[in-house]
């Protein structure tokens, strides 16, 4: 799919300033020079997003200082990242406040940014959560106030709501778009059937269908993004924005000898992650990561870079959301772009053999 490096050293990124926000990436491998597709369409919409985005879950308004958050956003923006994702529930709304303050302080043109937020869990009251017309409209209004913005580019339904009729949710999403509070809407953690239902309702009543599903995707979770979402993309144009490329840090290799202090698994409220890492399955994953580490060394990159590049190599993925708690981590993650051209079919096959979890679609069984 991409040319392989002709040298043993890691591919070098050349950054050249252009009129557009941030920079354009191009990789050189002797000749001819070939430009990587750093910006991709979000699903079949016309919205152009950087293939890497910066997420704010756990970090903004929580794990890191506001100063560090500003440093990370600036670093991301200067390196061509235009997509910044948050949610009303992150740090009980504080993540949106921090994000909004940074955008205002930096004075970046709003038109150069793609800001996305998610609605479902708002306040403690019964009416302050879910996907009712009331909460979608009031929740997004409150989000925009915290962000100090007139609109977000994409508003996501943060999970399905079995207590609200699909037509009500789709009508409310269409309403906030028509009111100029959002440009597009998408889903997060919805099943293919639920997304298909939303699309059908939109078509039936001449409403706006969703353009994107936000899904967890990493080396140990593949089925949805590799089998289910491509079918939806071809049928109805829904794209994939993925999160947790390092499986909450598991794929980074930092947990290979236990739980280090200050890591996400050591935080209050993340006992589930700690249990996952220390489980039998967690130990098996760590053994596989040791084998993957050898491939990373051969390619001249780190394990996190290999894992992120592996997510990016999937053409059905519009953007991979990164989480970072310091500048070095973010720059390392952005460096995954350099690894992407080196993921030849033989390397991918080798990774699949180690993981042993490649999902198969119906058409694979037929062939």
Swiss-Prot record:
Places the protein is found: Cytoplasm; Membrane; Cell membrane; Cell projection, Axon
Modified sites of kind N6-acetyllysine: 124
Topology versus the membrane: Peripheral membrane protein
InterPro entries from the UniProt entry: K_chnl_volt-dep_bsu_KCNAB, K_chnl_volt-dep_bsu_KCNAB-rel, K_chnl_volt-dep_bsu_KCNAB2, NADP_OxRdtase_dom, NADP_OxRdtase_dom_sf
UniProt signal peptide: none
Residues that coordinate or bind NADP(+): 56-57, 63, 85, 158, 188-189, 214, 243-248, 254, 262, 264, 323, 325, 329, 332-333
This protein's UniProt keywords: Acetylation, Cell membrane, Cell projection, Cytoplasm, Cytoskeleton, Ion transport, Membrane, Methylation, NADP, Oxidoreductase, Phosphoprotein, Potassium, Potassium transport, Synapse, Synaptosome, Transport
Modified residues (Phosphoserine): 9, 14, 20, 31, 112
Organism encoding this protein: Homo sapiens (Human)
Protein name: Voltage-gated potassium channel subunit beta-2
Effect on the protein upon substituting residue 90 to F: No effect on its activity in promoting KCNA4 channel closure
Major enzyme class: oxidoreductase
SUPFAM superfamilies in UniProt: NAD(P)-linked oxidoreductase
UniProt note: domains: In contrast to KCNAB1, the shorter N-terminal domain of KCNAB2 cannot mediate closure of delayed rectifier potassium channels by physically obstructing the pore.
Main location: cytoplasm
Membership in a protein family: Belongs to the shaker potassium channel beta subunit family.
Pfam family, any one: Aldo_ket_red
GO cellular component, one term: cytoskeleton
Function of the protein: Regulatory subunit of the voltage-gated potassium (Kv) Shaker channels composed of pore-forming and potassium-conducting alpha subunits and of regulatory beta subunits. The beta-2/KCNAB2 cytoplasmic subunit promotes potassium channel closure via a mechanism that does not involve physical obstruction of the channel pore. Promotes the inactivation of Kv1.4/KCNA4 and Kv1.5/KCNA5 alpha subunit-containing channels.
GO aspect biological process, one term: regulation of potassium ion transmembrane transport
PTM-bearing positions, type Omega-N-methylarginine: 28
Active site residues according to the UniProt entry: 90
GO MF annotations, alphabetized: aldo-keto reductase (NADPH) activity; methylglyoxal reductase (NADPH) (acetol producing) activity; potassium channel regulator activity; transmembrane transporter binding; voltage-gated potassium channel activity
Keyword Acetylation: yes
